[in-house]
Swiss-Prot record:
Family matches, as SUPFAM superfamilies: SAM/Pointed domain
Keyword Coiled coil in record: no
Subunit structure: Interacts with SEC23A.
Bias type Low complexity, positions: 154-167, 235-246
Protein name per the record: SEC23-interacting protein
Gene Ontology cellular component list: COPII-coated ER to Golgi transport vesicle; cytoplasm; cytosol; endoplasmic reticulum; endoplasmic reticulum-Golgi intermediate compartment; ER to Golgi transport vesicle membrane; Golgi apparatus; intracellular membrane-bounded organelle
Segments of skewed composition (Pro residues): 207-218
Organism for this UniProt entry: Homo sapiens (Human)
Phosphoserine found at: S737, S926
InterPro entries associated with the record: DDHD_dom (IPR004177), SAM (IPR001660), SAM/pointed_sf (IPR013761), SEC23IP_SAM (IPR037603), WWE_dom (IPR004170)
PANTHER family to which the protein is assigned, alphabetical: PA-PL1 PHOSPHOLIPASE FAMILY, SEC23-INTERACTING PROTEIN
Similarity comment: family membership: Belongs to the PA-PLA1 family.
Domain DDHD intervals: 779-989
Keyword Endoplasmic reticulum: yes
Amino acid sequence: MAERKPNGGSGGASTSSSGTNLLFSSSATEFSFNVPFIPVTQASASPASLLLPGEDSTDVGEEDSFLGQTSIHTSAPQTFSYFSQVSSSSDPFGNIGQSPLTTAATSVGQSGFPKPLTALPFTTGSQDVSNAFSPSISKAQPGAPPSSLMGINSYLPSQPSSLPPSYFGNQPQGIPQPGYNPYRHTPGSSRANPYIAPPQLQQCQTPGPPAHPPPSGPPVQMYQMPPGSLPPVPSSVQSPAQQQVPARPGAPSVQVPSPFLLQNQYEPVQPHWFYCKEVEYKQLWMPFSVFDSLNLEEIYNSVQPDPESVVLGTDGGRYDVYLYDRIRKAAYWEEEPAEVRRCTWFYKGDTDSRFIPYTEEFSEKLEAEYKKAVTTNQWHRRLEFPSGETIVMHNPKVIVQFQPSSVPDEWGTTQDGQTRPRVVKRGIDDNLDEIPDGEMPQVDHLVFVVHGIGPVCDLRFRSIIECVDDFRVVSLKLLRTHFKKSLDDGKVSRVEFLPVHWHSSLGGDATGVDRNIKKITLPSIGRFRHFTNETLLDILFYNSPTYCQTIVEKVGMEINHLHALFMSRNPDFKGGVSVAGHSLGSLILFDILSNQKDLNLSKCPGPLAVANGVVKQLHFQEKQMPEEPKLTLDESYDLVVENKEVLTLQETLEALSLSEYFSTFEKEKIDMESLLMCTVDDLKEMGIPLGPRKKIANFVEHKAAKLKKAASEKKAVAATSTKGQEQSAQKTKDMASLPSESNEPKRKLPVGACVSSVCVNYESFEVGAGQVSVAYNSLDFEPEIFFALGSPIAMFLTIRGVDRIDENYSLPTCKGFFNIYHPLDPVAYRLEPMIVPDLDLKAVLIPHHKGRKRLHLELKESLSRMGSDLKQGFISSLKSAWQTLNEFARAHTSSTQLQEELEKVANQIKEEEEKQVVEAEKVVESPDFSKDEDYLGKVGMLNGGRRIDYVLQEKPIESFNEYLFALQSHLCYWESEDTALLLLKEIYRTMNISPEQPQH
């Protein structure tokens, strides 16, 4: 906006005659039109004063030189062409950015209306908008506002009746009220599609003739130009933009639309809902997904019987939004409530990386001022608010905010960042592509994720909740790329991952261990000791008989609680459930799953048996035995042996996985009775190795104790009176008839409840110092797959004295088991060598999510193959040379010693060659190869006969220094696309759904 001249006045006094165009008078046509014109309101304005010389460019005001308005040679601001072209739609922003259809270029910063009208609303005097545009202007003035509508350059008519009094007030009675409310949609507005395309797209998509006034409105001739008010513009004076006017829909022959139609071109802003989230100790405003925002807006605009109690689930049902209180709460875990806003206006400073929404009250004020500016075409508005902020609306695209000025210090400087304004933005149309579409409400599969040591799960010190959020986002992206066809067909929806947090059960006032450890911790290297107490001590806690029970109970109860809560919030869920554990969490899950009870495999001797949380009544046997805890992995043979009524030596050895020694016992004429009388020395003399010898000795000791216990019980029963036996038999008969007499449904155990309680102590065995005896809770479901990420299960089993896992062993209630690890992970260990120690198998290489190996791995294999070929060729040549020497020696000598030496060298060369061939055939297996199927039955039944160990591909930079990336490798699983894709493949494999080729 050009700076006002000292003698400008208000335009009321002028010596020019009415209807005279100062820009296109006879004197004005003599000037060069390469220099833009500025309309002035001086009484003695000479033609020469209409030009803006170069040295006068410094007269441009501060507002004109702001944001996009630089010099007089630049193109005119968007506000000048705002009403200069024919609008092909009702969009007020459709012509922004196009050249104006005026006869002369308007100077930079000059509004489409003259100074008297545009300046009045911005002054601090008593004049306002209604006075500035009142119909009391009875005579055409030299500074009258040029109205360049529809390509016709004219002034507003001088007749008093040309502008109705209700122009800027109420609309004429004949016009139907559109009912627009920028904060509440109506059936007549965009309720069906709240996200309207940007104005530029609307103009391109809906070309056509200009909008005509509705039939019920005032007659169009009310606003037609009076005949002869403007002289015709010569064709030589017309600008290039004007010469193209006849080709456009708005030709000069088209009638000028009513000015009140411009008010109808205002479109209310489309709101979007945001929530405040703390990320790395910073407050960030995150947008809800498009799906969630539409649901929130629909509920917001609807009428609810009890608005204070309206709760809407978002983020796939993991969060609840309390609409009345404007807060967002987590549904499955403890988290600080987050503030929720219905956002329409945003700002961004120099130091901000993203736009920050204004409060809803402040946004309403801005929207009201913006609507006033659009309907009246009055820009460069300076809006001052009581809080001290000043907002200037230069045009629809350039709106800035100035911070309230602070008091300068003794050096005369103010705070940083206050001299530069903030950029203000209306709506989120430009960033709509960056907002996620949202998660589908239907869930195909549920996965519980248990964290490892410490309260943090990655190098950014994030909790398990944030890490699982990242893993969930990665899985959703892979669904759209690798399961696109199934997703489009509706066969696939999504997989839900819920975190299980247990570290808090060790600290706090519940156990008091934090206070005790703090007392004994040395004051030196405080941070390092704090890190050790928070992380590494979890491993020691799990090996403690007291805290191991606490950890196991916490994990079991939390999983059951989350499962019950998920089923209550998703009653239509019919999918499967799996579990995943990272680091120590995988060991906790392995122990829990190893101690689950499967009624299909064993008969529980107690009155109650728990399976999937359902308490079932069982018939009593004649001989009542107290319920015993589930045996650990190294005692799993006892469960098989005890279920056999008649035990033979061969069956016992098979249960102990020692069937290969049956011939040795048979040779010594040892049967089952003789075996129970054998000692360790006897087994040693028979040539039994140490490992099997320990197993047999442990079995003999355990069996002898049980026989002794059974004998004592039999003696006690024999001493009981006949009357007591009859009462016991009657009681047994009554309890056995309960299932047939009771028709009430089976009752559910409370979440985390356990049938029996076992004291925590150590059970000492011959192997090692002893193991922790823990009572494990029964899960309320049977998991389909168990995923172990960076797992130390094999190492813990080894230090417990388990040197081998039986090939026939499997988890009682879980049929799938995948041990996934990074090659540089210092905490991960393999499991397959414990099952098949004699079979040298490399881990299955997990393919890259883009369908190929990493480049450095392919190069490494190529170089390895090339080196092997060169070495093999060299050995072949050497062998040929030695054969030639051998033949030459045979022809010229008969020495047997020389002959033996040559044969010895030839044999060594042959052995080297065979060794190279074997090494060349050893390649890393891939799950896509048929060789994976060749090993069915050879790697045990822990994963249903399939491979167990799966290794990720290392990155090229990680191969340079293994030690540098060791810690990062243990924490890389949360953002690994390869890991997430393997989980999705195996989960949907249970649903007979295979991935397609990656769509990138």
